[in-house]
Amino acid sequence: MQNFKVSVILPARNEAATIGDLVLKIKDLYPGFEVIVINDGSTDNTAEAAKNAGADVYSHPYNIGNGAAIKSGIRVASGDILVFMDGDGQHDPSDIAGFLKYMPDYDMVVGARSIKGQASVGRAVGNKVYNWLASYVAKFYIQDLTSGFRAVKSKVAKSFLHLIPNTYSYPTTLTLSVLRSGWSLKYVPIKIRARSTGKSNIKIFKDGVRFFMIITKICTLYSPLRIFLPVSFVLFVLGLSNYIYTLLTQGRFTNMSALLFTTSIIIFMMGLISEQICQMRYERREMDRSQITKE
């Protein structure tokens, strides 16, 4: 931990009851760390409590979103390593040391919650489904897709600023973007404390749909055929099944079979073209990196 500077970023909205104690504990455990609190349009004295505890406080003029607060923190942080954690006191600052010991070898380390650490049974089941879907997309076993407690190298986080949404779904975007871009990721088990005050702002259905859309978006952005190919295959099988059935029962090739076959081919070609565009973007990015010279 002595070889690099660490910035701890705490997005907070109406967390006056917990933010001060959290900042004090971080500073007590890690005196040399930069602690940044992004006050996301709080209507209580969150900013004052954080400032009195010794944090560097930056405020949004109104509530923009948890992801927007993270992006603001990334922009102003000066550390080589950025640690993101919630401002409600559920994350234990002592776990940060366990993250950082892996940082020389990994680009991002994420705290993985146990099933018991999930806020509710419904959310635990939903997260399990999203973990499975994201693992398929990323070709990597994702233990906790939505965990907001993580450490990431600053250069990696900044490279995805344009993709991170303003909402609570930023962990999903960051995790999938890191994996699909070829950066390394490590999961570390953590325990989550119960909220002492307030309640979670995450809505299971609304945010669940958003998580699904983000997984699809990231997949089509970084590995389009992982989405297009299965859809094309299913339509082809349906078309083939319909063709065999109508051929045996009616002795002809129906319009439905033709439609399914044609749609299957179109979707496959769309995936192929998207994959080529994706590859060209990778090549352009690597070309830009190769032009950077050390002073």
Name each model-derived stretch:
Residues 13, 164-165, 267:
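Residues at alpha-helix boundaries and short interhelical turns
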Residues 1-124, 128, 151-161, 173-176, ...:
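Structured catalytic core of nucleotide-sugar glycosyltransferases
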Residues 224-295:
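Membrane-embedded multi-pass helical conduit in multi-pass membrane proteins
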